[in-house]
């Protein structure tokens, strides 16, 4: 007896990834949220074009921030590192839920157990909006 395989489409989303180098912490946060908003638009549009059976969307590396270019650890943490339960993850979770997709990407992230440091974290958000892999 053969097991039925479920088929799905995956999208490797390519988009302009703005850098936040040279921006203030506040302007960096605003830039990151605008980028997430654009991602929502592109995911929705891509699903309309390539099919509703798109179930996995993979975002580019450094999609929200670029990478540090001379900033100190403290400066980059303030500018680029997001909170585990912060606005950026909430917005990404909404995209996954609204489009019924697994959303995969990476981000610089703060961890309360390691104050003053940031981590480059890969994540997967499920269609229910839950971060299922970090």
Predicted regions and their residues:
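Hydrophobic structural segments
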Residues: 1-134
């Amino acid at each position: 007896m053969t097991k039925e395989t479920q088929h799905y489409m995956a999208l490797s989303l390519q988009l302009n990834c703005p850098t936040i180098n040279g921006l203030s912490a506040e302007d960096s946060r605003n830039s990151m949220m605008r980028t997430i908003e654009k991602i929502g638009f592109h995911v929705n549009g891509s699903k309309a074009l390539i099919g509703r059976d798109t179930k996995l969307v993979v975002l580019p590396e450094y999609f929200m921030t670029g990478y540090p270019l001379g900033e100190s650890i403290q400066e980059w943490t303030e500018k680029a590192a997001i909170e585990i339960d912060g606005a950026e993850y909430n917005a990404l979770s909404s995209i996954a839920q609204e489009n019924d997709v697994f959303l995969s990407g990476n981000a610089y992230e703060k961890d309360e157990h390691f104050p003053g440091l940031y981590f480059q974290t890969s994540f997967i958000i499920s269609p229910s909006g839950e971060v299922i892999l970090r």
